[in-house]
Amino acid sequence: MIYPKIALAQSIIEICSAKGIYNIIISPGSRNAPLTIGFAQNPNFKCYSIADERCAAFFALGIAQQTQKPAAVVCTSGSALLNYYPAVAEAFYSQIPLIVISADRPQSKIDIGDGQTIRQENVFLNHSVFNANLTEDASVENDLKINKAIETAILQKGPVHINAPFEEPLYQTVSELSVEPKITNLEEFLETKIIENEDEIVSIWNSSKRKLILIGGINEANSIDDAVLENFAKDPSIVVLTETTSNLHHPSFINSIDSLITPFDDSDFKELEPEVLITFGGMIVSKRIKAFLRKYKPVHHWHIDTLRAYDTFNALSKHFVMEPNDFFKNLLPKTEFVTSKYFSKIDKIYDLRKIKKKQYLSKIGFSDFKVFEKVIESLPKNSQLQISNSSAIRYAQLIEIDPSIEVFCNRGTSGIDGSTSTAVGAAVGSGKPNVFITGDISFLYDSNALWNSYIPKNFKIILINNGGGGIFRILPGHQEKPVFNTYFETSHHLTAEHLAKMYQCSYFKADDLSSLNENLELLYNSNEAPGILEVFTPTFENDVILKQYFKELT
């Protein structure tokens, strides 16, 4: 086998192999040549070449999201490293393991005016779970840092940074290893299955007539046992609110939070106000539920997560450091159902909301809302759905999604910058049929996501083009003036047609219901190349239709 001559590069590669790191995404450069040579010629790794570092990092994020194992990104020195930052931040807040390996110049070359050189050490300090700043020569100390970085990424489910200085010459190779790096054993994190102060928690649970369970994004399928979900559904004192990205389903759960609470007045909110709020999963999309819980605070807010708990509603009283499934399997057998009208009252309101929604959708014209209804209805069963941020995820929250479909969205930092790249990486990582729904600004922002040769041929993009950032028409402050159109909405007349041609994707387009239905069928049946269906919706009608929807729910 061919190895890089530089011993430090050998150590990094051998430790990655020993730790089971498999997916390596490499961006081209010279300073990282020792790493590229070693990773690319080692059969223990699956390597990908992606030129744009921002896209490469989000591509790796998508793979790690699906495999639940760290993916590594490798880049040269200088500003290349900084382009990883959006994905590093997303990985940090979404609890996704990501290993950043950056090549650097030796310490003596930093801040002396040498080319392609920045201060790389600790550059991700505020959004990483470990930073390994290596010295130039191979050593046990460096080996321990590399081991620690990889183990921390696994145990703390977050991004780590390994910064490796290399001196020229960079391209020399050898046929035998010159090092035997030290490999440490992963210290297993023993997750507790015991509830702290259990008697007190059981007492609070059994005495509470209004228990609200709010579930955010969950990337792991079947994370909660069916028996636990059934218990939630049968308890009249429990209301369960799920976000689209929770991937948890039950007929009694409320899966369109905004449809339920947007029309509420003060008396309705007081009916929903919980005594106990239990949260688990990732970041919450719905601004309305966050505003509600910040105003109508629960007496007790318990968050269940093995790593961290955010005081999102300024009411956090207890963080249970354990898996949610373990928490409920431990707690529920010791509890009893409480006589309450909490669920029945809220469920009755939600049933009426669903009737009103069906009536409204049946009468509206072609628009973003109508398109989302038809697109989500059309999704193939047992496929995966990736959704971009901004208005796309918010529309998706309003539509029922088949329980067999897994849903993902970059809600850690909620940015539009890497949604397409993440979706492509997720399609590669999962191996499942994957549909990506995105808006025009998000798609154009990350169009380099299509600049790689790894996109599965059955990957589908449904691009909803409303001529700008449609979410700004929904938000407060919208005024039809040049400043709004130029600086907020960023109005445009661009299409994806020529991008699709350049990247050899099949291209379809629709601008009414008939062409949408026709081209959705063509899109799903076309698997010779990745497909893009671009749907053009009316810029000036979308926000009016959505706002009227919430008015007609009462």
UniProtKB/Swiss-Prot annotation:
Matches recorded under InterPro entries: MenaQ_synth_MenD, MenD_middle, THDP-binding, Thiamin_PyroP_enz_TPP-bd_dom, TPP_enzyme_TPP-bd
Gene Ontology MF: a single term: thiamine pyrophosphate binding
One Pfam family in the UniProt entry: TPP_enzyme_M_2
EC code(s) of this entry: 2.2.1.9
Keyword Metal-binding (UniProt): yes
Assigned keywords, A-Z: Magnesium, Manganese, Menaquinone biosynthesis, Metal-binding, Thiamine pyrophosphate, Transferase
Catalytic activity entry: isochorismate + 2-oxoglutarate + H(+) = 5-enolpyruvoyl-6-hydroxy-2-succinyl-cyclohex-3-ene-1-carboxylate + CO2
Any one biological process term the GO annotation gives: menaquinone biosynthetic process
Protease listed as a keyword: no
Pathway membership: Quinol/quinone metabolism; 1,4-dihydroxy-2-naphthoate biosynthesis; 1,4-dihydroxy-2-naphthoate from chorismate: step 2/7; Quinol/quinone metabolism; menaquinone biosynthesis
EC category name: transferase
Cofactor: Mg(2+); Mn(2+); thiamine diphosphate
PANTHER family with a match to the protein in the record: 2-SUCCINYL-5-ENOLPYRUVYL-6-HYDROXY-3-CYCLOHEXENE-1-CARBOXYLATE SYNTHASE (PTHR42916), PROTEIN PHYLLO, CHLOROPLASTIC (PTHR42916:SF1)
Assembly mode: Homodimer.
Family membership noted in the UniProt record: Belongs to the TPP enzyme family. MenD subfamily.
Name listed for the protein in its UniProt record: 2-succinyl-5-enolpyruvyl-6-hydroxy-3-cyclohexene-1-carboxylate synthase
Organism: Flavobacterium johnsoniae (strain ATCC 17061 / DSM 2064 / JCM 8514 / BCRC 14874 / CCUG 350202 / NBRC 14942 / NCIMB 11054 / UW101) (Cytophaga johnsonae)
